[in-house]
Amino acid sequence: MTGLGAVTPLGGDAPSTWRAAVAGESGIDFIRAFDASEFPVRIAAEVKDFDPSQVASPKDARRLDRNVLISLGAAREAVADAGLDGVYSPDRVGILFGTAIGGFISIIEQADVLRERGPDRVAPTFLPNVLVDTASGQLAIALGFRGPNYAPVSACATGSTAVGEAAELIKRGDADAILAGGAEACIHPLVLAGFCSMRGLAAEDEHPPRASRPFDATRAGFVMGEGACVLVLEELEVAERRGATIYAEILGYAMSNDAHHLAQPDPESVGVGEMMRRALERAGLEPEQIGYINAHGTSTPLGDAAETRAIKQVFGDHAYKLAVSSTKSVTGHCFGAAGAIEAMMCVRAVHDGVLPPTMNYEHPDPECDLDYVPNQARPVQVDVALSNAMGLGGHNGCVLVGRVP
């Protein structure tokens, strides 16, 4: 991995996102995008102070969906960070970039136009602008990369799937470099209402940054987030020859499904456990070689307990020696972007020798009894880190990243 780009609730670029996560600074606050005063939940982790004109033409800044615009910001940063311009033939650079929902806000806006102004006023760009693959296609147009390009969709595991599949494409020889990641921008009254109806969200009116409490006994739900993250992957030997900054390497990757419920985790954690075992096997690693897990850790009562159970099943006694943290305690849950953002957290953790904390962890839960790096970053060098991602529909993905000496 030679380039990182991010637009998140913690900052407008990858370095500021990482610094804030390590410092335990929260991106969770009262919703600004609309008046949420009539909702039982009024908080979210929004991308703040994003200026579309910095990443797109005035025309595109007006017509493209927010999820595409923040994707452009993350992608341009990652390409610049990797020094990728002119290195490879455009035909050999691919893009695997997904989203869970796509151009949701544009769909609602055009539905309002149809209802209020009639069918003749619906924008001709409406349909191309809201597809799940719009962002991956628009990134290719903006950057000129003509290699393999598609939009993996696995709900909240989308970003993880994109990163893992990108590595597989490069291994097969289908591309020399891949931009991989995900984005989501769906903080909207309808989405908020839907999650409120599911009773999945945390409500914290007095102090929003305390709402997301992964693995804490008082956790009461997740916090909606938004963001985009792109990681540039290349062949290790080629990156070394050209003198690129190498943050980390991908050692293994696996997917699975719970085959249990569309919205609830399997309490036995069979699918998640099998996924981690398979990733370790593919990487040729023993469980004892893993030093850090960036957990899916959404702060839901069922989800955090199930993930902890899976970690203990796979790692045995070593589970209690592992460091496990959830950066969703400060980013909220960025859905399709989450897996990519958290893969980036693992990359920086092994590269920088510091583990980001789980904030707001104050009350131990007997079902969640591991080392969750509570409330303060931990300077420690780990050689291998694992990023877990789980999504609605039972989709699971994990990526193993290793330090490059």
Give the ranges of each region predicted by the language model.
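Active-site-proximal alpha-helical scaffold in enzymes
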Residues: 71-83, 135, 140-143, 148-184, ...
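Condensing-enzyme catalytic core mediating Claisen C-C bond formation in acyl metabolism
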Residues: 1-2, 25-30, 206-283, 291-292, ...
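Short beta-strand-to-turn element immediately C-terminal to the catalytic PLP-Schiff-base lysine
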Residues: 10, 231-235, 281, 312, ...
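Short pre-catalytic strand/loop immediately N-terminal to key active-site residues, enriched for Gly-Thr
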Residues: 122-127, 147-154, 216-220, 322-333, ...
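Glycine-/small-residue-rich "gating" segment that lines the acyl/pantetheine channel
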Residues: 116-123, 161-164, 168, 177, ...
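Active-site-adjacent elements of ketosynthase-type condensing enzymes
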Residues: 36, 40-45, 102-106, 185-212, ...
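Flexible, low-complexity linker/loop segments at domain and module junctions
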Residues: 1, 89-90, 283-289, 319-320, ...
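Conserved beta-ketoacyl condensing-enzyme motif
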Residues: 1, 18, 22-154, 183-192, ...
